[in-house]
Curated annotation (Swiss-Prot):
The keyword Magnesium does not apply. InterPro entries: Hfq, LSM_dom_sf, Sm. This is RNA-binding protein Hfq. HAMAP family: Hfq. GO terms for cellular component: cytosol. Coiled coil: none annotated. Belongs to the Hfq family. It comes from Pseudomonas fluorescens (strain Pf0-1).
Length: 86
């Protein structure tokens, strides 16, 4: 994973796994809403009544409908290890 994706991928993956609704604002001002079905390096599949493939270079902002908690770097590396048990 490249350094530029160290926040983007876990953020999008959390939104996908928890099926959090999102508003995606495009650079031209259009607002799309739905849930993230899948994503890769270049696109996000957004599902509402239909699935739309949205190119990441066209996205300005991704806004979840509720706050989400991202796993910390130590949690994702340590797996089941609990904080404070070093």
């Amino acid at each position: 994973m490249s350094k530029g994706h160290s926040l983007q991928d876990p953020y999008l993956n959390t939104l996908r796994k928890e099926k959090v609704g999102v508003s995606i604002y495009l650079v031209n001002g259009i607002k799309l809403q739905g849930t993230i079905e899948s994503f890769d390096q270049f696109v996000i599949l957004l599902k509402n009544t239909v699935s739309q493939m949205v190119y990441k270079h066209a996205i300005s902002t991704v806004v979840p409908v509720r706050p989400i908690r991202l796993p910390s770097a130590t949690e994702s590396e340590a797996g089941d290890a609990e904080p404070g048990n070093a």
